[in-house]
Amino acid sequence: MPIKFDVTQEHIESYPNFCIVTGVFNDSYLFPSTIQIDKMSQGYISSLLKRNNFNGSINQHLLLYDAPYFFNKLILLIGCGKKNEFKSQSYNTVIHYIINFCKKSSITKILLLLSELNIDGYDNYWKIRNSITLCNNECYIFNKFKNINDVTKKNITYEIISYIDKLDNNFQYCKQAVKDGLAIAKGLNIAKNLGNMPSNYCTPNYLSNKVQELSNYNTDLDIEIINELQLKTIGMHAYLAVGSGSIYPAVMPIIKYQKNPKGPNTNPIILIGKGVTFDSGGISIKPSDKMDEMKYDMCGAAAVYAIMSIVSELQLPLNIIGILAVSENMISSKSLKPGDILTTLSGQTIEILNTDAEGRLLLCDVLTYVERYNPEIVIDIATLTGACVIALGNHYSGLMSNDNNLSNNLIFASKQTRDYIWRLPLDENFEKQLESSCADIANVGGRSGGAITAACFLKKFAHKYKWMHLDIAGSAWISKNCVKSSTGRPVELLTQFLINISKI
């Protein structure tokens, strides 16, 4: 369900066909805009609130039809709780409730009078951009493979306008929030759509072609596709081993964006996304329960693809390289086996103890490959370990890094976007779990601290630059109440991180 979003300083009378949405705090404390509407309707709202015992509790609502002396047919009053307790989470809750109520009520034109809400530490830019991404998430639906007869499942367009007071001198800043918000929302949908594609459609070839298509309509992005033969010539044997059992050859698409005003040779920021289009576990096969969800094992690559589209649209003054580590982990007579030993691009050898720990085999060779770019920062994004889901659930992505300042900056961006991350430790005690009797390193370190030992494995290949690892195994998709969908995380988080860097 697509959305159109804009801001306006025109009088609300200019939007007679829109449902006016305004708020009421606890104990019927009216917003300034609600007071204005009440006066225009000659006290109709205040008297109605008293008769209906409407006290402004959070998410309490009252939909008014044809208020007297008022030009709009619909007014939605939404409870916002106690004024002194209204926080950023309260704002998100209210927006979420409004959009869901309007969807159920078939209201498609919405005029929000909520910018006057005061939230400590958050300005109108945040409120507007956050409203856009929240509305986009609530309206998102993946129905590509459904035969649609039900009108409620069709792609209905929602038109949402946020009113900004005429006394607000930062209207252009609000317009920028719309531009940024719509670009991020579009990117989130791109990531979700890719993540939700079934693996018989979204093969390594499909992802490679999607990246190649970017150059057809975006001249700011340079595309390079490294094929299986080239990967072998380079010496990326760990990378190639992952897809050895698949009929689809491994591939490594690279997306380059160079807009740093200091020139194209300025050290780039590199994003690496794990793109296992289906992960059967290989010889160490996964349980059949929920194996269908292993189509989501390419959500890291989908996120990188989406972020590169966003930064190009926003024209961020940075040099950024996005790399999609794409393969399929299947079973055949050629598959990687437990006990095998691989020689990586770095020269380090790996003993394979579990073929279901395949993502790190892709990433370790890419982490070595990117040394040629002399990167400023490297961030890998991967649905890497079930252990991270056990540790952090579905609410937080796991962060592990070799740089404290970089980690703090990413944590700050996570608070800005409410796409939360939690930093986990990296130290030598965990590295001991990866010791091998016959190779330089084992590819797993036992059950304890699995998310951390996976990051410790990657750390051995990322010692020449500032590096962060995001384990999104718990946050990349949702699976509950018969609903399964990619979330698009951490697209907004990393986009905000890049926006923050671009302003330094």
Curated annotation (Swiss-Prot):
Entry's family note: Belongs to the peptidase M17 family.
Single GO BP term: proteolysis
Reactions mediated catalytically: Release of an N-terminal amino acid, Xaa-|-Yaa-, in which Xaa is preferably Leu, but may be other amino acids including Pro although not Arg or Lys, and Yaa may be Pro. Amino acid amides and methyl esters are also readily hydrolyzed, but rates on arylamides are exceedingly low; Release of an N-terminal amino acid, preferentially leucine, but not glutamic or aspartic acids
UniProt name for this protein: Probable cytosol aminopeptidase
Paired cysteines (S-S): none
Source organism of this protein record: Blochmanniella floridana
Active site: K286, R360
Gene3D superfamilies named among the record's database cross-references: Leucine Aminopeptidase, subunit E, domain 1, Zn peptidases
Cofactor or coenzyme needed: Mn(2+)
Cross-referenced InterPro entries: Leucine_aapep/pepB (IPR011356), Macro_dom-like (IPR043472), Peptidase_M17_C (IPR000819), Peptidase_M17_leu_NH2_pept (IPR023042), Peptidase_M17_N (IPR008283)
Enzyme Commission number, as recorded: 3.4.11.1, 3.4.11.10
Co-factor remark: Binds 2 manganese ions per subunit.
GO molecular function, one term: manganese ion binding
Residues annotated for Mn(2+) 2 binding in this entry: K274, D279, D297, E358
Positions with a binding annotation for Mn(2+) 1: D279, D356, E358
Record carries keyword Manganese: yes
Protein localization: Cytoplasm
EC class of the enzyme, as a word: hydrolase
UniProt keyword annotations, A-Z: Aminopeptidase, Cytoplasm, Hydrolase, Manganese, Metal-binding, Protease
GO cellular-component term (any): cytoplasm
Function: Presumably involved in the processing and regular turnover of intracellular proteins. Catalyzes the removal of unsubstituted N-terminal amino acids from various peptides.
